[in-house]
């Protein structure tokens, strides 16, 4: 029986660093048995992944799922294109965003939900270099403030 709840498998930290995420969608993904076993072991890389809408279907590209050790002949190409499962209304919404200049579909995380593998897909706009610098400066300032507060509490 499938376990209840969610378990995070992999996150795309680079996506949140390189893009402003405007909206997220929970999607299913079409996988083969050995890919499911490999993902459950956490052997995937989504750092370079992106999604594209083609003929009213959404496909995931450049997500590397390592071959399952005991899979032998049943293993598929690690970088193959995989179909994402969404409702028609969600796909229409994605098409509307992607047709605008600068929007990209990025996989943010893979997780298990009630025994099924789900992908969190985000709609992002690329950050400029100065935006990244501002984010880093804000994080540094927050760290300094936390450090000062901890030092004052110790005294």
UniProtKB/Swiss-Prot annotation:
Biological process per Gene Ontology, one example term: trans-translation
Pfam families: SmpB
GO-annotated cellular components: cytosol
Keywords, comma-separated and alphabetical: Cytoplasm, RNA-binding
Gene3D superfamilies, per the entry: 2.40.280.10
Localization of this protein: Cytoplasm
CDD domains in the cross-refs: SmpB
A GO molecular-function descriptor: RNA binding
Family (UniProt): Belongs to the SmpB family.
Task of the protein: Required for rescue of stalled ribosomes mediated by trans-translation. Binds to transfer-messenger RNA (tmRNA), required for stable association of tmRNA with ribosomes. tmRNA and SmpB together mimic tRNA shape, replacing the anticodon stem-loop with SmpB. tmRNA is encoded by the ssrA gene; the 2 termini fold to resemble tRNA(Ala) and it encodes a 'tag peptide', a short internal open reading frame. During trans-translation Ala-aminoacylated tmRNA acts like a tRNA, entering the A-site of stalled ribosomes, displacing the stalled mRNA.
Alphabetical list of NCBIfam families matching this protein: PRK05422.1 (NF003843), smpB (TIGR00086)
Protein name: SsrA-binding protein
Source organism: Alkaliphilus oremlandii (strain OhILAs) (Clostridium oremlandii (strain OhILAs))
Gene: smpB
